[in-house]
Every structure is written in C-alpha cells, then in structure tokens.
C-alpha cells in the first residue's frame, strides 16, 4: 500500500478516535456543568475523566497535525 494511502487511513482512524473521545468528554463536561448550575461540588471522578479525555484528545490532535503535514508533503 502506498504511503499516501497509509497516512490517509491513519488520519481517518485518528479522527474517529478523537470524535469518540470528544463525545465522552462532552458527557463529563455535562456532569461538571450540572454540578456548577446546582451549586454543588463536582464529583472527583468526573473531573478526572474530563482531564483524561482532554489530554488524550490533545495527543491525538498533535499526531493528526503531524500526519496531515506529512500527507501534504507527499501530494
């Protein structure tokens, strides 16, 4: 398989993974917002999940940028 096709496939996989992580992060964000609106302390686990998902998204976003740049140089 050509390098361009491999990069395009990997980019597509990363985008899917990021979309899934963003959905999970949105659920945690909703729980955190509910706590804020209800004027109560947020659950520690929700804060940890939010931070974890955010960190994973950032790592994948950096990888996506890197792969996209590589793909642009091949075109």
Predicted ranges, named:
Residues 2, 57, 67-69:
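Short, low-complexity interaction segments enriched in Ser/Thr/Pro/Gly
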Residues 17, 24, 31, 56, ...:
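Interface faces of extended alpha-helical assemblies
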Residues 61-75:
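Long amphipathic alpha-helical coiled-coil segments
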Residues 1-23, 48-55:
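Short, charge/polar-rich alpha-helical segments
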């Amino acid at each position: 398989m050509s390098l361009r096709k491999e990069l395009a496939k990997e980019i597509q996989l990363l985008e899917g993974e990021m979309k899934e992580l963003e959905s999970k992060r949105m659920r945690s964000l909703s729980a955190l917002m509910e706590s804020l609106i209800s004027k109560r302390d947020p659950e520690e686990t929700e804060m940890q999940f939010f931070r974890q998902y955010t960190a994973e998204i950032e790592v994948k976003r950096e990888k996506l940028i890197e792969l996209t740049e590589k793909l642009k140089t091949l075109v």
